[in-house]
Regions:
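Extracytoplasmic loops and strand-loop junctions of Gram-negative outer membrane beta-barrel proteins
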Residues: 5-12, 73-76, 84-92, 132-135, ...
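Gram-negative outer-membrane beta-barrel transporters
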Residues: 44-46, 58, 62-173
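Outer-membrane beta-barrel signature, preferentially recognizing the C-terminal barrel domain
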Residues: 1-39, 43-47, 69-73, 82-102, ...
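Residue-level detector of the transmembrane beta-barrel scaffold of outer-membrane proteins
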Residues: 1, 37-39, 117-121, 151, ...
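C-terminal beta-signal and adjacent terminal beta-strands/loops
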Residues: 46-49, 159, 167-217, 229-235, ...
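Outer-membrane beta-barrel proteins
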Residues: 12-16, 28, 91-95, 110, ...
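Outer-membrane beta-barrel translocator domains and adjoining extracellular loop/strand segments
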Residues: 1-4, 42, 51-57, 64, ...
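Residues on the lipid-exposed face of transmembrane beta-strands in outer-membrane beta-barrel proteins
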Residues: 16, 26-30, 103-109, 122, ...
Length: 299
């Protein structure tokens, strides 16, 4: 079965107020030694008057497969019928609220004592970020449960330095489609200027231009937003630098290697309709291993 929405005429004003947020933060900090610092922080953010699409009384159109029918043909689907329900409009209104809360820990090593060659820090954060809309709990796009950062810098002597950074983040939410559905259009069949007759949309067949086939759209579901998570993100970057003086100027030569173990980190997914009417998915990833050589000069 599939549904299509008919939008009711917009009656509301396009004016809306500003979104509001109140932040509550508490933190503790303690020097364990002259070089080691421990810091922890907890927070809560209360979001109000978040802007969402206005819901108005409209109509959903519903069609089902005909048993044994050809799904590429209009005859393979029942005639679309109206199912009274709510519809999302493009009118923005302040009609949602949300919250974000979490805790962060930081252990930092300062390079403050004579003979100390290493500095860096380790951090960990645990967080939740949700909005509440239409009795649904929906994560924000930036909702990330766990993040870890490990950063270090070591002096090798003779103006050589080695630095590294490892990052980890659990997956961000995204909306996974639930399948495909025929596209339903409203046509003006009585020439009164009002499209009101629902039909299953078709186009010329690629295989046979003399016949038409049903147009399919990706079905994300009516209340299915951010129902899945991307894979975790992590990578290791290193940097080697050498400082020297040439021609009475300060020179720094460096080698950067980003994503040294060539991790495939997913940015997102692109969904499309395959020729065999299955749901296709293409992974969009960040850059692979990327070495860079360069220098800088201070005049």
């Amino acid at each position: 079965a599939t549904r299509s929405r008919e939008r009711a005429p917009a009656q509301a004003s396009w004016r809306q107020g500003a979104e509001k947020a109140i932040h509550y933060v508490v933190g503790l900090e303690r020097w364990l030694t002259s070089e080691w610092l421990l810091r922890t922080e907890a927070y809560y953010k209360d979001f109000r008057d978040l802007i969402v699409q206005q819901i108005e009384q409209g109509g959903n159109y519903f069609t089902e497969r005909v048993p044994g029918g050809d799904i590429r043909s209009v005859s393979g689907w029942t005639r679309p019928v109206r199912n009274i329900g709510d519809s999302l409009t493009q009118i923005p209104i302040n009609n949602s609220f949300g919250e974000a809360y979490g805790v962060e820990f930081l252990l930092e090593k300062k390079n403050s004592e004579r003979g100390s060659n290493f500095s860096g820090w380790i951090s960990y954060a645990y967080a939740h970020a949700n909005r509440y809309q239409r009795r649904d709990i929906i994560p924000f796009a930036f909702d990330q449960r766990h993040t870890v950062n490990i950063v270090g810098n070591y002096s090798l002597g003779s103006n050589w330095e080695l630095g590294f950074r490892w990052q980890y983040g659990s997956g961000f939410p995204y909306t996974e489609p639930i399948g495909l559905k025929p596209r339903i259009l409203l046509l003006d069949t009585d020439n009164d200027g009002k499209p009101e007759t629902p039909v299953v949309a078709t186009r010329a067949s690629y295989a046979n231009p003399n016949s038409n086939e049903v147009i399919f759209d990706i079905d994300y579901g009516d209340r299915n937003r951010f129902n899945a998570r991307k894979p975790a993100y992590h990578r290791l970057d290193i940097r080697v630098t050498k400082a020297t003086i040439l021609w009475n100027y300060d020179w720094t030569f460096y080698l950067d290697i980003i994503n040294i173990y060539n991790r495939t980190n997913v940015v997102g997914y692109s969904f499309y309709v395959e020729d065999d009417l299955t749901l296709g998915r293409e992974t969009n990833s960040m850059f692979p291993i990327l070495p860079t050589i360069g220098f800088s000069v201070k005049f």
